[in-house]
Amino acid sequence: MHEFFLYYIKKKYVIMFKHLISFIKTVYQNYFEIASCLGAVFIILLAIFMDNYLGLEACPMCIMTRYAFGLIAFISFMGVLTNKLYRFNKLLIVLSSLSGIAVTGKQIYLQNLSPEEIANLSMGCGMPLSTQIEYFGLIGGISNAYQGGPTCAAENWRFIFNFAEWGFIFFITFLLLTGIKLIKGR
């Protein structure tokens, strides 16, 4: 009796897993742009929630990460509206993902420095990103913020990974899935 019960439960989980895989394939093949847009918007909303309700302050690199997610959301939404620019939209998502990987990768690098190395960093993350862009111009402000600083090296939140590591994982996922779509065509 006990073995039959275990067999029955195992069979149910296998069927449920097959349905889940089938659902993921359907979403990937038919609703990729909508899923990408919603996923990126969800990540941005989560970051805003963490700022406003958990009292965490976003450093300039975190803001640049949000902009990369925003680009992915916007380009994915435009992909839903315009089917004629399919390859161009996918290429823009790949470029946005690469920029997000660069920013989050640099932030992860900064977070893994020793305290002595962090103390020797420039103050690239000392001012808010908007202030840096106002003083140094768009390219200068982004370049200065990308250099990083002690503020960007701080880990304020962790759920298995910190926010930069989660962002890195999501950007890699966006890059791989979009790259496969770009190579295969539709």
How should each PLM-predicted stretch be described?
Residues 66:
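Cys/His-rich microdomains that often coordinate metals
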Residues 6-60, 69-72, 83-186:
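Secretory/periplasmic and organellar redox-cofactor proteins
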Residues 63:
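Cys/His-coordinated zinc-binding microdomains
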Residues 79-80:
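Interfacial segments of multi-pass membrane proteins
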